[in-house]
Curated annotation (Swiss-Prot):
The keyword Signal applies. Predominantly expressed in hypothalamus. Also found in heart, intestine, spleen and testis (spermatogonia, early spermatocytes and Sertoli cells). In brain only mature MCH and NEI peptides are present. In peripheral tissues a large product, encompassing the NEI and MCH domains of the precursor, is found predominantly. Disulfide bonds join C153-C162. The lineage of its organism: Eukaryota, Metazoa, Chordata, Craniata, Vertebrata. This is Pro-MCH. Pro-MCH is processed differentially in the brain and in peripheral organs producing two neuropeptides; NEI and MCH. A third peptide, NGE, may also be produced. Preferential processing in neurons by prohormone convertase 2 (PC2) generates NEI. MCH is generated in neurons of the lateral hypothalmic area by several prohormone convertases including PC1/3, PC2 and PC5/6. Pfam families: Pro-MCH. Keywords: Amidation, Cleavage on pair of basic residues, Disulfide bond, Hormone, Neuropeptide, Secreted, Signal. The keyword 4Fe-4S does not apply. It comes from the Eukaryota. Belongs to the MCH family. The modification Isoleucine amide is found at I143.
Amino acid sequence: MAKMTLSSYMLMLAFSLFSQGILLSASKSIRNLEDDIVFNTFRMGKAFQKEDTAERSVVAPSLEQYKNDESGFMNDDDNKNSKNTGSKQNLVTHGLPLSLAVKPYLALKGSVAFPAENGVQNAESTQEKREIGDEENSAKFPIGRRDFDMLRCMLGRVYRPCWQV
């Protein structure tokens, strides 16, 4: 009886392993998908930088270039080398987002976009902020400064207990 249950378990295990091994999956590689998103982000950044958004409409990657081939979204290049799985139909059913909510770095202006130009001014203003306050007059500091000191204390970067902040 024990040999029969052991052999039936081994048979079920072998069947499950072989049934999963026969099926081959094909999908669009994540690298190609990320490259498309990065390319479209830079394209949108250039449009924002030139401020011609009214004349030129920038569209996110459309779903027409991707085909639903029962296993995911695939490019036309990837369709030539793909194999049909059949059983993994509903793994990827949501698709790509229609609009990217990411602001590209190229769209930023001023000191945020080019911090190297304003580096000297930022260093001087930081030094002035450090020289202004004493630790005895911590009420003059904004709340953010006291929170920062508390976080430094909690991280263990200073050699004093947290209640002395």
